[in-house]
């Protein structure tokens, strides 16, 4: 009797979790009201089903890996595999609200690192070519003092 009630309460809580709507939660109090034993098993079944629904352990390594990739600067290679990884990690048995939160977090990490680092690297490359290209030609013809001043100014800029 206990196993059967535990299985039915477990299937109802899992259907509630997979659908993300409260309609599947209404039959659960009817099962709990049958007796004290079913109330205890329903509480145990819900306790066992809550960690897979929230998914705290798989999400944290994914976010940490995204941060490590964004720090290294390889945003072009990390942008394409990060979206399938985040969807596959958040698909099993998540409510709609949790799914939206984890999806927006992964997009924000990838989007911010991609937009901040790749144009920044291009701007640094343009600065080097723009400053060094014209500035070397006149300074070789001019004085050595101007050359040393340009070196100190470039050191402060970077």
Swiss-Prot record:
Transmembrane segments: none
Biased composition (Low complexity): 72-90
Biased amino acid composition, Polar residues: 1-18, 111-120, 149-158
Signal peptide (UniProt feature, chain positions): none
Region (Disordered): 1-20, 66-94, 111-158
Protein name: Putative uncharacterized protein MRGPRG-AS1
């Amino acid at each position: 009797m206990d196993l059967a009630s535990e299985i039915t309460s477990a299937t109802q809580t899992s259907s509630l979790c997979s659908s993300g709507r409260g309609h599947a939660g209404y039959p659960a109090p009817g099962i709990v009201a049958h007796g004290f034993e079913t109330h205890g098993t329903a509480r145990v079944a819900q306790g066992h089903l809550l960690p897979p629904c929230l998914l705290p352990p798989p999400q944290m390594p994914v976010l940490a890996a995204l941060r490590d990739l964004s720090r290294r600067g390889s945003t072009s290679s990390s942008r394409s595999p990060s979206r399938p990884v985040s969807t596959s990690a958040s698909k099993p048995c998540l409510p709609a609200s949790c799914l939206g939160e984890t999806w927006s977090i992964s997009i924000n990490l990838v989007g911010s690192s991609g937009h901040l680092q790749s144009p920044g690297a291009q701007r640094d490359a343009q600065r080097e070519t723009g400053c060094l290209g014209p500035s070397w030609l006149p300074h070789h013809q001019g004085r050595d003092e101007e050359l040393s001043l340009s070196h100190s100014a470039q050191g402060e800029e970077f």
